[in-house]
């Protein structure tokens, strides 16, 4: 009888936000659990693909290359329609699976992806400003330095979870 191969096609890495300290830790854990096919799946980023590919090769794992986007439909939000996020009406997570590596994105498409990531980062920067206004209002005695968060806690894509992590530090 053929053995079924264990697959995890949806692993977030520090290239967007991750519970793992680095790509190596994620892949070491997958290998230890005999997961043989592993997919990187970061928000708005393909930046980790090379490292993912190389680290998979050293562990004899089969790499998948994926990407994830979050969309918001304001009409669905107003109507309370939940798509695939049970807590946020109108929000939809879209995940592209089995993308090419090396990345063959150029020109208009590469610029569109860069623009989406820049807007996502700008949105989180606006969240940081609101968080700092709240911290000031409650006289917390500290604030979150957005540029420092980007520098110390990210690999270019900043998420609201990075702000939460900075707040706990």
Where are the regions that the model predicts?
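Extended, H/D-rich, highly charged conserved domains that either
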Residues: 155-169
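A metal-dependent hydrolase metal-coordination microenvironment
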Residues: 2-158
């Amino acid at each position: 009888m053929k053995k079924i191969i264990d697959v995890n096609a949806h692993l977030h890495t520090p290239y967007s936000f991750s519970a793992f300290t680095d790509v190596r830790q994620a892949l070491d854990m997958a290998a230890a659990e005999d997961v043989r096919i592993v997919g990187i799946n970061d928000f708005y980023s393909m930046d980790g693909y090379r490292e993912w590919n190389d680290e998979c090769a050293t562990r004899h794992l089969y790499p998948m290359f994926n990407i994830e986007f979050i969309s918001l439909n304001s009409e669905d939000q107003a109507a309370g329609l939940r798509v695939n996020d049970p807590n946020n009406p109108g929000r939809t997570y879209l995940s592209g699976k089995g993308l090419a590596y090396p990345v063959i994105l150029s020109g208009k498409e590469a610029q569109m992806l860069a623009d989406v990531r820049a807007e996502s980062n700008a949105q989180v920067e606006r969240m940081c400003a609101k968080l700092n206004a709240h911290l000031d209002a409650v006289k917390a005695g500290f604030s979150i330095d957005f540029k420092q968060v980007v520098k110390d806690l990210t690999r270019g894509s900043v998420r609201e979870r990075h702000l939460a992590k900075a707040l706990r530090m």
